[in-house]
Amino acid sequence: MWFDVHTHQLSACPSEAIFNCEGSYIPMPGEAAFLSVGIHPWYLSKENYSHRLHEVEALIKHDKRVVAVGEAGLDKYAEAPFALQEEAFRAMCFLAEQYRLPLIIHSVKTYNELMALKKALHPSQSWIIHGFRGKKELAQSLVRQGFYLSFGEHYHPDALAVLPEDTFLLETDESCVPIKELYRRAASIRGRELMPFAVRMEQLVNSLFFNR
């Protein structure tokens, strides 16, 4: 009911969260029912790129818990050369298409680049920008271009308030705020009763991650 689409913490309800795998740590099945895996620009280098790409694809192929590719993305503040970031991001896009999985995106100061890549690549799988904190005008522009947005603990309330309900998701990311509280806050911002709002969100989660 209170599905968390992106978290770095093991959930008390493993069947209601997508745990983001980083590095070589893979939780046991009893700890996490669903996983995402990708190459994060923070942890990317010329030396580890080929190895990480192999690791990511191997996990997608062999662990049925993987329901999304990511985090993957572009970050103007990351140490990795931007050209390498883009190469890795394109590789993650390819894996998302090949294995028919949604793509969870990390973006810092790179929305223009993301929009250009989406137009160039014409992906058939969903692109979900996680931890979105932009203003409502940017949110509306991204949604018009087919992106989904995922909101965590911190965001502009007016951005969440104006979006169609089938275009955004909720996540804890690294926050200690319970996911149910984030649902409560979002429902309040949108003037919705909590339970009907949660049911509508569950329908979107199912359509994006579990309709295969």
Where do the model's predicted regions map?
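Mid-domain alpha/beta scaffold segments of enzyme catalytic cores
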Residues: 1-212
